[in-house]
């Protein structure tokens, strides 16, 4: 057995305790066994490392890749994880991103990756950074607990976990208070362990334009920002301090607006709500892909995706652009039944308008007390109610 060192003018990497053959004619080393570690990233060679099986190195290249390695991180878990390994001979800031290990499995469970925070999904170690990797199907899951009960579940294709911060550009969020919850399919997610604070940002103009759903109060809420210091009772809903006047709308999922119903149709022969409802009846599922719906509707896929996104932004369904899947919401059926006079409806809407904006802090429009479930809304000048049919 030998210790193998590979270097160029940009950097180097090492493989210890390996053996193999070097083929001069094609400049390749074919190895069996050996160990690689993360010693250059500050961890001891017996705490974070990978054992190699069969591998090949093209000495004309500056990188080395190995499949089916057994990875160990004794700081995080007590079992080996099988996956692929990559290292490059690079210098400067690029060197911080190597070595890389990526697990094959996407259902690895790690408890207390931070205090009261569990993880399930794929495992990637890029340099010194743990990447919670769900790949393309948003299967990486962060679970935050409080007093032994889960208070938040976040699903994403990827979470970045650095020191005391967990971040995702887009995560499906379910925030629990007892048996009820607030839900949104795509929010920017930040959790600070040092502050024990959760921040959820919703881009009203982007793919996350759908309103937030509150199951207890049966409301949709188009707040831009949710903040919660999880040791406190109140969840804050509001917006960023970017304008002189800030508005947040709260709307009953049993509400109906005839003008909105007709505006959805445009020049279409069939109202989109009816088309989706008919598809659900024929397919037998409320969760479907954009490709499945495009095939049913007879439209090209590039037209169906914005079609579904528009319905999502108005709260009739949730549409996940990372997976191109839709989940029909109760509001869609309420609208159809109200239009056909098959059910009662209301026009309960609250418009919260805040004008006394000071400083750079969050503009608070509403507070939800997780114990009493009271929802206090600021800046409501009037409430218009109608009689149910």
Per-range role (PLM):
Residues 1-389:
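Structural signature for solvent-exposed beta-strand/loop edge elements and short helix-capping sites
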């Amino acid at each position: 057995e030998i210790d193998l060192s590979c270097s160029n003018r940009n950097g180097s990497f090492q493989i210890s305790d390996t053996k193999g053959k070097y083929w001069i004619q094609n400049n390749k080393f074919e190895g069996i066994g050996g160990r690689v570690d993360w010693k250059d990233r500050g961890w001891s060679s017996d705490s974070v490392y990978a054992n190699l099986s069969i591998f090949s190195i093209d000495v004309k290249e500056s990188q080395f890749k190995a499949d089916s390695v057994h990875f160990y991180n004794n700081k995080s878990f007590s079992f080996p994880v099988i996956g692929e390994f990559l290292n490059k001979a690079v210098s400067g800031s690029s060197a911080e991103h190597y070595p890389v290990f990526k697990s094959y499995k996407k259902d690895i469970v790690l408890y207390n990756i931070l205090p009261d925070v569990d993880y399930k999904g794929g495992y990637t170690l890029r340099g010194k950074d743990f990447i919670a990797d769900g790949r393309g199907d948003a299967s990486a899951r962060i679970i935050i607990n409080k007093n032994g009960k889960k208070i938040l579940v976040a699903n994403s294709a990827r979470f970045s976990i650095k020191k005391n911060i967990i971040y995702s550009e887009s995560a499906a969020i379910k925030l629990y208070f007892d048996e009820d919850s607030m839900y949104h399919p795509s929010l920017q997610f930040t959790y600070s362990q040092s502050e024990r604070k959760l921040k959820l940002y919703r881009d009203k103009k982007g793919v996350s334009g759908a309103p937030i759903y509150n199951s207890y109060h049966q409301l949709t809420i188009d707040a831009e920002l949710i903040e919660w210091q999880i040791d406190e009772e109140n969840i804050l809903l509001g917006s960023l301090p970017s304008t002189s006047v800030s508005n947040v709308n709260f709307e009953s999922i049993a509400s109906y607006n005839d003008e909105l119903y007709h505006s959805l149709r445009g020049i279409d022969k069939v109202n989109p709500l009816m088309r989706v409802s008919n598809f659900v009846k024929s397919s037998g599922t409320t969760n479907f892909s954009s490709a499945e719906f495009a095939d049913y509707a007879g439209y090209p896929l590039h037209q169906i995706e914005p079609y579904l996104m528009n319905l999502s932004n108005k709260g009739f369904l949730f549409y996940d652009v990372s997976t191109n899947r839709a989940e029909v919401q109760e509001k869609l059926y309420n609208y159809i039944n109200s239009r056909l006079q098959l059910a009662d409806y209301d026009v309960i809407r609250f418009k919260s308008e805040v004008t006394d904006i000071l400083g750079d802090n969050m503009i608070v429009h509403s507070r939800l007390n997780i114990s009493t479930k009271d929802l206090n809304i600021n800046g409501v000048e009037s409430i218009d109610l109608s009689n149910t049919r």
